Amino acid sequence: MPHTKASPPPLLQVRGISKQFSGVVVLKSIDFTLQPGQVHALLGGNGAGKSTLMKIIAGVLPPDSGTIEIDGQPCLNLTPAKAHQLGIYLVPQEPMLFANLSVQENILFRLPKHQADKKKMAQLLQSLGCHLDLAVNAGSLDVADQQLVEIMRGLMRDSRILILDEPTASLTPAETNRLFSQIKMLLQQGVGVVFISHKLPEIRQLADWVSVMRDGGIALSGATNDFSTDTIIQAITPQAKNSELTDTQKLWLELPGNRRSQARAQSNQPVIQVCDLSGEGFAHISFEVRAGEILGLAGVVGAGRTELAETLYGLRPVSGGKVMLEECDITAMKTVNRLATGLVYLPEDRQASGLYLDAPLSWNVYSLTQGNQGIWTHPAQEAAILERYRRALNIKFSHLEQPVRTLSGGNQQKLLIAKCLEANPLLLIIDEPTRGVDVSARSDIYQLIRSIAAQHVAIIFISSDLEEVVQMADRVLVMHQGEISGALEGSAMNVDTIMHLAFGEQTAFGEHHTDAHQRAENEGASC
């Protein structure tokens, strides 16, 4: 959007930005504009170049060519410190906090004294509707609260250009609405917001302007209301995409059968029985999951879902109750023994807990099973394993020794799934598998999960995206304040019912809810 002498220049004007890594072109002469008081949404598939472009604007990476202007003034040799001085702040998709510092120390870190105003910080927190304990260590926060701390760091720096990379990926609907209210207040003050998201309804709700990146270029750009949802999706993934895995992919994905057999699956015996289990953040939880079943676990942030998953995996202590895996009592087992028995956990935060970002791809996939192979590496075996999962999961990478951190978010998530599958699970606990993943990669991951379940693996599927819980799960348990507030199956499995139960509204939801809840109670009594 060019400006004239009568109109003020754009807040941010990017012209002809290009970038290569090791001879591979990742940005091709990008033009991008942000006006004061505007939300400019940026979409694109994983690897489209969104993060690279934003890192250049934030001074993290230098461009190979092109210019960046703020208020019409060219910015040369931009660095993160200089970007902060100019009012540019990038809130990353994966929170980058100091785990051993308090929330307050993280928010005020490296702020000049004249900006380190605790009263202002308290006012901002109140306006966001946040109830963060400023004294606790940031490492103790869940991902949603860590994201809010990152946003607070930007707001405390009086940012005029706020880059939000998937800011709502781990937020509840209520937290998302509060964030949007705060963004709208900032817009009235002339702040411009670059909003990176894969959630099209949010973009429709918030963004004035939308740009779609594909293969390092701009495939579509204009006023949001000028484009239909289908047009935007087509710009992201123009090729007609088959939603089913090919027979070849299914063959490559076939898991070893020593832990799962047709006879065992047909016996209808539960793979896992959780009996009146209590631990940090939850109490008196009972349920069963059978071979080939996908059990959805829904609830708002803080409901205790991740705490329950980590306790089942042995990362947190049990304070009461029992866990049986195929009639073997694993309640007192260490994590390594649970893993060896067939209980595998895909964590919520792939970068902090799931993958070794600076290690090679092949080593990451092999890492869960290395304890069974001794201390020596097996390059040929690692290469063969990675190649199998590359074909099965369509993981895109350049070479085997490539560090994980160089992959896009969707490919990192597929690599984490490969790592979990190589451990040969009986029960796979999947926590937020599509957080920060684009539309195309989400479809891939859904099909992968269904294919895994079809091989008689029991799956516990945890997600804050209630629509995908309904889409993926055979049954749904809803948690509220650490307890099961409802069990749903059949026609009772819908977003509205789950939302009511997630907020503790114990209204009668019909016979499917009643029968399913009674079933959950019976499962606890059967241990």
From Swiss-Prot:
Which InterPro entries does the UniProt entry name for this protein? AAA+_ATPase, ABC_carbohydrate_import_ATPase, ABC_transporter-like_ATP-bd, ABC_transporter-like_CS, P-loop_NTPase
Q: Which Pfam families match?
A: ABC_tran
Give me the reactions it catalyses.
Answer: ATP + H2O + (2R,4S)-2-methyl-2,3,3,4-tetrahydroxytetrahydrofuran-[AI-2-binding protein]Side 1 = ADP + phosphate + (2R,4S)-2-methyl-2,3,3,4-tetrahydroxytetrahydrofuranSide 2 + [AI-2-binding protein]Side 1
Q: Where in the cell is it found?
A: Cell inner membrane
Q: Please list the GO terms describing molecular function.
A: ATP binding; ATP hydrolysis activity
Keywords tagged on the record = ATP-binding, Cell inner membrane, Cell membrane, Membrane, Nucleotide-binding, Repeat, Translocase, Transport
Query: How does this chain assemble?
Result: The complex is composed of two ATP-binding proteins (LsrA), two transmembrane proteins (LsrC and LsrD) and a solute-binding protein (LsrB).
Function, as annotated, reads: Part of the ABC transporter complex LsrABCD involved in autoinducer 2 (AI-2) import. Responsible for energy coupling to the transport system.
Note the PANTHER family from the entry: AUTOINDUCER 2 IMPORT ATP-BINDING PROTEIN LSRA (PTHR43790:SF2), CARBOHYDRATE TRANSPORT ATP-BINDING PROTEIN MG119-RELATED (PTHR43790)
* Name this polypeptide is given: Autoinducer 2 import ATP-binding protein LsrA
Q: Supply the source organism for this entry.
A: Yersinia enterocolitica serotype O:8 / biotype 1B (strain NCTC 13174 / 8081)
